[in-house]
Structures are given as structure tokens and as C-alpha cells.
């Protein structure tokens, strides 16, 4: 059963890396380092105007599709920010239609790649529309508090 949601726009403030899925799957990716940096309490304390505690991972600035480079932003939802500390970035997640998928429960390093591989293999009909490749995001709520028995939701932007 497809879960298509109209999602309001919001802001995420955090840290970024430019990467691609081939690099991430090879073991030479940057996302693990982004998480290590983000999880330092001193970094989270610097995020201004936080309006939530659940980390959000944003995939944006796609070069092409899921095979090209993209910007990965890991942060927290925040109200609009004008001045940011060094090394932090703000991105606006646009309002729009998103297909929502829940991962299986298990170790994060296993369930996150698995859900994305399922999404990449889906036809537009299975997704509920054509992917926009503008912005996708993952929400790490309380179900992801235990990294060895976690579940996340993935929001895939649609046209």
C-alpha cells in the first residue's frame, strides 16, 4: 500500500557533504563521517532556533538522479535562520507530495541502505508518481533511538 503525503515546507540546519551512492556503497563514503560529527553534543548545541530533537537527513541538490552526486545534510528542524555558526548550513525542504516508506527494523547501517535499494528499484507506478530528485529526507525519530534495532521513515519527493 502506497503512502503519499502532502508535506508542508520546513527548514533543517546541520552539516553537509557532497557525495554519491556508488561512493557510499563502496565503503569510502562521507555519510558516516557526517554522522560522527553531528553526534557531538557541542555541534547540536550550536544549531540555532531548533524546533525538534529528531535528526533529519536530507538528500538535495541532485546532479541527475540517484546515480549522480547529491548534497547530504544531517541536522535538526529549525525555524528560519539568518545567521549561522561556521560549518552549519540551512536548507529549506519544499512543500509538496512525498511517497513515505518505513524501513524494516534492525541495525541502522543495514536498514537504511536496504530501504533505499528498494526505492531505487521501484517504478513510478510503485512509487506513486515520478521522483522529482529535488529533495528527499529521512526522519530518525524515537524508533531509531537504538541504532541496533532501528526503524526510519524515508520521504521521497514526487512531481
Describe each PLM feature range.
Residues 1-159:
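A solvent-exposed interaction/effector surface
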Amino acid at each position: 500500500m502506497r503512502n503519499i503525503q502532502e508535506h508542508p515546507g520546513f527548514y533543517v540546519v546541520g552539516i553537509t557533504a557532497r557525495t554519491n551512492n556508488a561512493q557510499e556503497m563502496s565503503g569510502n563514503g562521507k555519510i558516516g563521517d557526517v554522522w560522527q560529527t553531528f553526534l557531538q553534543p557541542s555541534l547540536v548545541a550550536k544549531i540555532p532556533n531548533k524546533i525538534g530533537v529528531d535528526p533529519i537527513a536530507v538528500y538535495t541538490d541532485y546532479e541527475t538522479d540517484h546515480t549522480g552526486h547529491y548534497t547530504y545534510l544531517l541536522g535538526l528542524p529549525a525555524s528560519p535562520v539568518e545567521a549561522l555558526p561556521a560549518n552549519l548550513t540551512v536548507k529549506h525542504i519544499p512543500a509538496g507530495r512525498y511517497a513515505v516508506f518505513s524501513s524494516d527494523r534492525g541495525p541502522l547501517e543495514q536498514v537504511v541502505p536496504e530501504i533505499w535499494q528498494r526505492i531505487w528499484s521501484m517504478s513510478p507506478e510503485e512509487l506513486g508518481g515520478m521522483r522529482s530528485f529535488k529533495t528527499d529526507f529521512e526522519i530518525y525519530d524515537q524508533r531509531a533511538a537504538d541504532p541496533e534495532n532501528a526503524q526510519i521513515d524515508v520521504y521521497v519527493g514526487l512531481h
